[in-house]
Amino acid sequence: MADPDHVASIDAIVRAAYDVISGSSGEKRDWDRERSLFYPGARLIPTAKPGATDGLAPQMLDVEGFIARVEPYFAENGFFEKEIARRTEQFGCIAHVWSTYESRHNADDPEPFMRGINSIQLFYDGNRWWIVTIYWQQESAEHPIAKKYL
């Protein structure tokens, strides 16, 4: 069950989504909290290269698949992700958030090791917000983040 404060608004659920995955190396993440943010059947979709010689492609994950993918990394590496800019559009009970992020290994690192954009689709059921999809791509030399997203 989600904490009502974490799902009461678009701001709250986006903040919770970043907070739950952030922590020091070896710090256990609250995966029940993570699960509580997502609508049943929700997807997390990193854009990545499946193999060294492959091009970018969406990697379709459910919440459990995402946890299985990142948990070993978090056990060995600090990971702190924070939102640095946002564009939100809403119609009725659906919302779309372009959320630009920076990632650091330590919360106080002066520079991020990675930046990118999360495309977050949300649903409001009349009582709370749910994450339906987070689809993201890291910034690269080939795909720098446009000023309108900063």
What are these regions (language model features)?
Residues M1-L37, L150:
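Short, low-complexity N-terminal intrinsically disordered segments enriched in polar/charged residues
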Residues A17, E34, A42, V97, ...:
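Hydrophobic pocket/interface hotspot
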Residues I21, F38, Y101-S103, Y135-Q137:
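Short beta-strand segments enriched in hydrophobic/aromatic residues
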Residues Y39, G65-R69, F79, M114-I117, ...:
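Non-catalytic cap/lid and distal C-terminal segments of serine-dependent acyl enzymes
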Residues R43-L44, A48-D109:
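Surface-exposed, charged secondary-structure patches
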Residues P58, P110-P112, W129-I131:
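Tryptophan-centered short beta-strand motifs
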Residues R115-I145:
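Short beta-strand edge/turn micro-motifs at domain boundaries
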